Structures are given as structure tokens and as C-alpha cells.
Amino acid sequence: HYMLGDTSYPDDLGQSIPFDEFYARMAAGEMTKTSQVNVDEFLAYFEGFLKEGKDVLHVSLSSGLSGSVNSARIAAEELADKYPDNKVLVVDSLGASSGYGLLMDKLADLRDEGKSIEEVRDFAEANRLHLHHWFFSTDLTFYVRGGRISKAAGWFGTALKICPLLNMDDEGHLIPRQKIRGKKAVIQQIVKEMENHARGGHDYNGKCFISMSACMDDARAVADLVEEKFPHLNGKVMINNIGTTIGSHTGPGTVALFFWGDERTH
């Protein structure tokens, strides 16, 4: 869930508020905050599937960013006795945004290949740290507003056109890695990180997703460079919106790059 102004909304992929409107209202000064899904909501959601005789594999937003995975686990335990013939399995993605979207894309393929729910869960837990998440932001306003950097640092950073480059570590936390001066340089560097870490290097033949918050031109510039450097990609780079939960913290002006690679470190 997220708050925009004085109203609470579900994070429903832009259905309640279109993404462009959401980011425009943030840019105009409306405040945002987020809250995790509670146990009762998970109970109601999971039970809808269990009543139909279905098993559930729930893959959660990183525990390094949200406590929702704990609510999901409690709900799964509470339902186990009531529905002994079906199961709810919960996986901590240790990922976010289209990073764990890329994981879900692979898990759906495994399901469609006939793998059991346990086999799909085991793959997720064994491979989740091979999904790289790299982010940069061209607008420090919302990092200052959220208290992640000081007003002074934000002022100097903006004056010097500093773009922070972050990634997600092996515990699912977002970690600042570099401060890069200028948009062109940070676009080059984020693709350089893919060159350094992608499975197979320039021969990488997996999928690549990009997410962005109201900065399609920047996202397209990253995608074009990725497609130039990695000619064997599985299809074109897919560009999505950063959702409202993550976007509430980043604000507009953030681009995120996701791909399969070596194991993430601390």
C-alpha cells in the first residue's frame, strides 16, 4: 500500500492512479509513504486460491525493503491446518521491481514446463541472488525528502549533477555504490556493470528488463546501449514502470537495470 497526500491506495500496477499521474503529483510536492501488506490481507488472498483447490507459491518483495514476507509466512502457517490437502509456499525474493519480475518470468516458464511447486520454489531460492539490480537517479529531491541524504548533500549533488548509482546486495538491501557526475556518464557506468556481471559477459543470452519512473528517454538510452553491447539478448530489452511502492521512495527520474549474472555480494 502507499499513501499519496491524505489517501491510501493499493499498489495495483497503476490501476488506482496511472503512473504518469503518480509521479507528476510527487514532483508537484505531494508526500508519499508506504505500508506493508498485513496478515489478514494475505489470509483472504491466499484462501481464495485454496478454496479452488490450488496450491500457492508466493514470491515476496525483498525482506531487506519490507516486512511483508513475514506477514505472508504467518498467513501460510495459519492456513496449513485448515487446508491440509493444499499448500502455500513463501519465498523471499531478495529483489524488487522488475528484478523480481524477471525472476517471476523464469518461474512461470518452469511451471509451464511441468515442474512441481517445490521444484519451482527451490529454483527461486537457489537462483535469486543471480538477479542483478542496478539503479541510478538523476533527481535527488526525493532522497532528501525521505531523509536518505542531507539537504546540504542534496544541494551540492544537484549543483554538480551527481547521479548516485546503487545496487541490491545479497541481503536484499539497496546499497549506494558510486556517485557519478552527469547523466551520460552514469548511463555508461550502469551498462558497464552489466558487462562486468552478466552471465556470459557480452555473450549474455538471457532477458533484460529496465524499470523507470517518468524518465522514458533515459531508460531508452540505457536499453539502446545494452542492445548494442549484448547482441545475443533473448529478445529486446523490456521497459516497465517502477511501481508505486518503490517509486514512493525514489520519486521520478530513476532508472533500474535487471539481468541474470554472477552471485550478488554484500
Descriptions of predicted regions:
Residues 1-41:
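N-terminal glycine-rich anion-binding loop in soluble enzyme alpha/beta folds
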Residues 1-9, 64-68, 72-77, 83, ...:
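Mixed-charge interfacial surface used for oligomerization/domain docking
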Residues 16-22, 46, 50-51, 78:
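A short glycine/small-residue-enriched secondary-structure motif
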Residues 27-63, 70, 74, 121:
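Glycine-rich phosphate- or other oxyanion-binding loops that anchor nucleotides, phosphorylated ligands
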Residues 54-58, 86-91:
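Short, flexible active-site-proximal loops enriched in glycine and acidic residues
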